[in-house]
């Protein structure tokens, strides 16, 4: 694991802190590169300015739909969708970064951060990174607390800036 990526988060437009991620580019280089490039915005599109549109308490935070903002959009740097790279990494701890999808080989730009163990997602979603440190995980927990069982958030959670470190 080498690449580090960050999100500077706002909650209802107020700065809330930074989430830093370690990407597992040694195991899933293509998936990690997609996330890194979307974080830097170097292809002319990406995560900056988008929101966490779905936050389910005791499950996960989902974001990455920078085209529609509601979970129906987004795109990868490789085109609309790309194939599942592999399922070597398991959802075996909290704070993992994994690709959201609409079924087999439908990865785009949407991702989620786990807040509990999610073994039922193994073999269905590609794990490609992790929350890097305790301060970042504390912010993930703060965002999780704004979620609900339906996924609707009680405040607007935005990725104000993002990039690589």
UniProtKB/Swiss-Prot annotation:
Residues 6-164 form the PPIase cyclophilin-type domain. Keywords: Cytoplasm, Isomerase, Rotamase. It holds the Pfam family Pro_isomerase. PPIases accelerate the folding of proteins. It catalyzes the cis-trans isomerization of proline imidic peptide bonds in oligopeptides. This is Peptidyl-prolyl cis-trans isomerase A. One of its GO terms (biological process) is protein folding. It comes from Streptomyces anulatus (Streptomyces chrysomallus). Belongs to the cyclophilin-type PPIase family. Its main location: cytoplasm. The lineage of its organism: Bacteria, Bacillati, Actinomycetota, Actinomycetes, Kitasatosporales. It catalyses: [protein]-peptidylproline (omega=180) = [protein]-peptidylproline (omega=0). One of its GO terms (molecular function) is cyclosporin A binding. The keyword Nucleotidyltransferase does not apply.
């Amino acid at each position: 694991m080498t690449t580090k990526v960050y999100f500077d988060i706002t909650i209802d437009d107020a700065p809330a802190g930074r989430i830093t991620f370690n990407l597992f580019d040694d195991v899933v280089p293509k998936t990690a590169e997609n996330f890194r490039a979307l974080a830097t915005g170097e292809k002319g599109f990406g995560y900056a300015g988008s929101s966490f549109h779905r936050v389910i308490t005791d499950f996960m935070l989902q974001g990455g739909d920078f085209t529609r903002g509601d979970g129906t959009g987004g795109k990868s740097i490789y085109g609309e969708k790309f194939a599942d790279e592999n399922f070597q990494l398991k959802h075996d701890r909290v704070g993992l970064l994994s690709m959201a999808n609409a079924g087999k080989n439908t990865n785009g730009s949407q991702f989620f951060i786990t807040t509990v163990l999610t073994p039922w997602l193994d073999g269905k979603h590609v794990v490609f990174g992790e929350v890097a440190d305790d301060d970042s995980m504390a912010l993930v927990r703060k965002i999780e607390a704004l979620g609900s069982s339906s996924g609707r958030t009680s405040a607007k959670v935005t990725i104000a800036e993002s990039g690589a470190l």
